[in-house]
Regions:
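Phosphate/diphosphate-binding loops
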Residues: 197-262, 374-395
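Conserved small/polar residues in nucleotide/adenosyl-binding loops
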Residues: 478-487
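Generic beta-strand/beta-sheet core signal
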Residues: 23, 61-63, 139-141, 165-169, ...
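Active-site cores of enzymes that catalyze phosphoryl transfer or operate on phosphate-rich substrates
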Residues: 82-163, 242-310
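Signature of lipid phosphatidyltransferase scaffolds
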Residues: 6-12, 18-22, 235-310, 396-402, ...
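Extended, highly charged clamp/arch subdomains and adjacent linkers
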Residues: 1-91, 107-112, 126, 133-143
């Protein structure tokens, strides 16, 4: 358009051209529309997505050399202050870069492909028998997500399986998990999908998946108006000789095969009855538009997650130097939690924080946070697990779940955490933190002033993510030997 502008305007002289890219607010809220209303949430979301295209501009990028007059005109037309207009010589829209890898020889420019380890202990047709005896931890992307997908297909074909219930937040394109759920519904299983339509920038994808799953016969629920459903929870209910058995999956990341190759996440698969009962209660309450209060095993936000977390921090604080708190999350800004961690440090309790992104708690401040350390791993994969560890030795407790320590997670979302009690699974979670602690190549250590530095005295190179590939490949075969021994 810019190139042919003189032709477009006939006899007029074009003095100046520029490419302007406008970024608009993505903040759409259904709360005001839905409160006290029985409107169809999917239809409401579709209207809101159309409205998003007309929301107020928050930024403009101008590509090329432009005059002050042109800049002023762009700001006036868009209603933007000077600080929100950016002039760049680079292309304003870089999305074309994603198509470039297929056009060039990138030999030597990319990381070597490392396929995820297959858990050889699991054989198709044997999943329920295995899980009846063992908990299983899947560590992504070091191990494949395929066992979970296979479990859904096995549930679909098992005549004793009554239902599959799952929370869905961000699905991959051409999702095999969505296909497995549709297959189960088409083969007579009751499949209930609690699909969060408000997953930012995945709204349209989730609307499309809701229609596909509904057409296959799945029951589609859209969660609660006041709380986003962010928990990663799947429940398979099956008839067993003694009655009903629950097989539950609690995870830290989305049911997304694409991010399973790029994000570090954990999935716990268990037949623990208490976890199953809590999961069943959770799906029942959410189906009625209610949150979950008292539970046996799971920590569930917004009611139970933060109080349980604070109680465990307080218990370690009372132990002073004998206590230990280890936390791995993506981000932290919850003021109450941070204040409690400061108290723990003041009592002499060791507090290790592994926070990949924003952390509003500064470590190493004399008299306040000198027993707190903050470490971030920035490597090939995006660190995404949420892990809590309390105590030392045999009394040590380990938890994994879906929520960060942002106030939106502790107060305004549905999240779920579970204890990891199986000795093998527990050891594997602890090894993740141990590897991050030893990393001296991709680690960044927060300083008291909020800056980050590489570890001092690095010594022999150790990359946690590379090590964990090797570790979890070996773990798969360890599980096989243990399973064969018990048989």
């Amino acid at each position: 358009v810019a190139h042919f502008a003189p032709l477009l305007f006939g006899e007029r002289r074009v003095r100046e051209t520029a490419i302007v890219r406008v970024t608009r607010s993505a903040d759409i809220s259904v709360r005001d529309i839905m409160d006290g209303c029985d409107a169809d949430l999917r239809a409401v979301m579709e209207r809101l997505l159309r409205r998003r295209r007309r929301l107020e501009p928050v930024r403009a990028q101008v590509q090329g050399r432009v005059s002050d007059e042109m800049r002023a005109l762009a700001r006036e037309l868009l209603g933007l202050p000077k600080r929100q207009l950016f002039v760049t010589s680079a292309p304003a829209d870089l999305s074309f870069v994603l198509t470039m890898p297929g056009e060039f020889d990138l030999t030597g420019l990319t990381c070597p492909e490392i396929p995820p380890a297959k858990n050889v202990a699991l054989q198709k047709g044997d999943y329920f028998a295995y899980l009846a005896q063992h908990d299983l931890l899947l560590a992504l992307p070091y191990q494949s997500i395929n066992p979970f997908v296979d479990l859904l297909y096995e549930a679909a074909d098992d005549p004793d399986v009554v239902s599959i219930k799952i929370t869905l937040y961000r699905l991959a394109g051409s999702s095999r998990i969505a296909a497995a759920l549709a297959y189960a519904a088409e083969h007579g299983k009751q499949v209930q999908c609690l699909l969060e339509l408000r997953a930012r920038f995945d709204e349209q994808s989730n609307i499309d998946y809701s229609r596909m799953l509904e057409d296959a016969g799945c029951d589609i629920l859209y969660g609660l108006t006041k709380y986003k459903v962010h928990t990663k929870l799947c429940l398979i209910t099956r008839r067993c000789p003694g009655g009903i058995c629950y097989y539950t999956q609690v995870g830290t990341g989305n049911y997304n095969e694409k991010t399973a190759e790029q994000y570090t996440d954990l999935m716990l698969l268990t037949s623990d009855p208490a976890i199953g009962r809590d999961a069943a209660k959770t799906f029942d309450r959410l189906a009625r538009g209610e949150t979950v209060g008292e539970t046996e095993a799971l920590w569930l936000a917004p009611e139970g997650y933060k109080p349980q977390l604070m109680a465990h921090i307080e218990a370690q604080t009372r132990l002073g130097p004998e206590g230990y708190i280890g936390i791995k999350v993506n981000s932290m800004n919850d003021a109450d939690v941070m204040a409690r961690l400061v108290r723990a440090s003041e009592a002499g309790t060791e507090v290790e924080l592994f926070v990949r992104g924003i952390c509003c708690l500064r470590p190493g401040v004399p008299g306040r946070t000198e027993h707190i350390s903050v470490r971030s791993i920035i490597g090939r994969y995006l660190e995404h697990e949420r892990i809590f560890v309390f105590g030392r030795g045999e009394a040590q407790e380990v938890f994994i779940g879906s929520g960060d320590l942002l106030e939106r997670n502790t107060m305004r979302r549905i999240e779920a955490f579970t204890a990891v009690t199986d000795p093998n699974a527990r050891a594997e979670v602890l090894e993740v933190l141990s590897a991050m602690r030893r990393d001296n190549r991709q680690a960044w250590i927060m300083q008291p002033d909020g800056s980050y530095l590489r570890p001092e005295g690095a010594g022999e190179p150790f990359v946690s993510q590379a090590y964990l590939h090797t570790y979890f490949a070996a773990v798969s075969y360890t599980h096989l030997r243990a399973h064969e021994t018990r048989h």
